[in-house]
Amino acid sequence: MTFSVIKKVIEIKKDIPFSDEVELSWFDMQKPNLTAVTKKGVNLVVKAKFTHLHENDILVCEDGIGIKVKRSEDEIFSLEFSDALTFAKTAYEIGNRHQPLQIEEFKIIVLDDISIADIIKDCYANESIKVEKTKAYFKPNGKAHHSH
């Protein structure tokens, strides 16, 4: 039987030496508690009270090992609109589901999430909305989805 050691993160620092890296999605970086596996296969658990993780944070484990946080690309939908009313209604509906969104001129970018699957389906059916599913770095607007 093989056992793997789970490292507990005890501190989050900046600009210190590190020996491993972990890639996290935007969503995972917002979680106060998470488990992850580093590039070298180390299992770790993070309990980041009163904050969330940022790219280039160094997670300091109980044994002093430093693990650098890197962003992974997210599965996203890009929705491009030809009119202001459809744009506003769609943004309202997504916001009403408490989902973060990235707003640009006549464009909304959202994470692929089951809670808005029906909205995305409706967007595909609407000829005035161009829908594209892709992988990219998600950068939501505002601070509505920060740690409270």
Swiss-Prot record:
Subcellular location(s) of the protein: Cytoplasm
Gene Ontology biological process terms from the UniProt entry: protein folding; protein-containing complex assembly; urea metabolic process
Example of a GO cellular component annotation carried by this entry: cytoplasm
UniProt entry keywords in alphabetical sequence: Chaperone, Cytoplasm, Nickel
InterPro entries named among the record's database cross-references: UreE, UreE_C_dom, UreE_N, UreE_N_sf
GO-annotated molecular function: nickel cation binding; unfolded protein binding
Gene3D superfamilies: Urease metallochaperone UreE, N-terminal domain (2.60.260.20), UreE, C-terminal domain (3.30.70.790)
Pfam families from the UniProt entry: UreE_C (PF05194)
Similarity comment: Belongs to the UreE family.
Role: Involved in urease metallocenter assembly. Binds nickel. Probably functions as a nickel donor during metallocenter assembly.
Record's protein name: Urease accessory protein UreE
Organism: Aliarcobacter butzleri (strain RM4018)
